[in-house]
Amino acid sequence: MAKKVVAQVRLQLEAGKATPAPPVGPALGQRGVNLMEFCKKFNAATADKAGMIIPVIITVYEDRSFTFITKTPPASFLLKKAAKLNSGSQEPKRKIVGKVTREQIKEIAEIKKEDLNANDIEAAMKIIEGTAKSMGIEVVD
């Protein structure tokens, strides 16, 4: 018989640097999950992606065991990295804060394709371009 799911927790954590401190501690501690066990498993699973922000979905079961699924880094994080920015524009449609090339958009779309609701790379690129525009990043050829 399958275990009963008690909760699903979504977090965005830096790869290889999860600690029992907030945000991990409060989110998982109140559900009775062994924090150190989660941190060790997450850090081991994401050690090769150091420096990136990794979204993770943690499924907590009735017996306090857990499983987790890591996703690809957020498009906004990858765009900021490609454009060498610390943050997006405060006024996205009016103020341009950086530029990315179509080639960089394609690379980001390749990375994100498995998590995006897109059938082909062109559709994934359009999604990433929309994210770039909403951040005040200009797409150039």
Curated annotation (Swiss-Prot):
Q: Which UniProt keywords apply?
A: Methylation, Ribonucleoprotein, Ribosomal protein, RNA-binding, rRNA-binding
Report the PANTHER family cross-referenced here: 60S RIBOSOMAL PROTEIN L12, LARGE RIBOSOMAL SUBUNIT PROTEIN UL11M
Biological process (GO), any one = translation
The record's listing under InterPro entries reads: Ribosomal_uL11, Ribosomal_uL11_bac-typ, Ribosomal_uL11_C, Ribosomal_uL11_C_sf, Ribosomal_uL11_CS, Ribosomal_uL11_N, Ribosomal_uL11_N_sf
What is the designated name of this protein? Large ribosomal subunit protein uL11
Domain of life from the UniProt record: Bacteria
Give the source lineage, highest ranks first.
Bacteria, Thermotogati, Thermotogota, Thermotogae, Thermotogales
Query: Which Pfam families did the record assign?
Result: Ribosomal_L11, Ribosomal_L11_N
- Identify its protein family: Belongs to the universal ribosomal protein uL11 family.
Report the transmembrane regions from the record: none
Give GO cellular component annotations, separated by semicolons.
cytosolic large ribosomal subunit
| Organism per entry | Thermosipho melanesiensis (strain DSM 12029 / CIP 104789 / BI429)
Posttranslational mods: One or more lysine residues are methylated.
Q: State whether it acts alone or in a complex, and with which partners, per the record.
A: Part of the ribosomal stalk of the 50S ribosomal subunit. Interacts with L10 and the large rRNA to form the base of the stalk. L10 forms an elongated spine to which L12 dimers bind in a sequential fashion forming a multimeric L10(L12)X complex.
State one molecular function term (GO).
structural constituent of ribosome
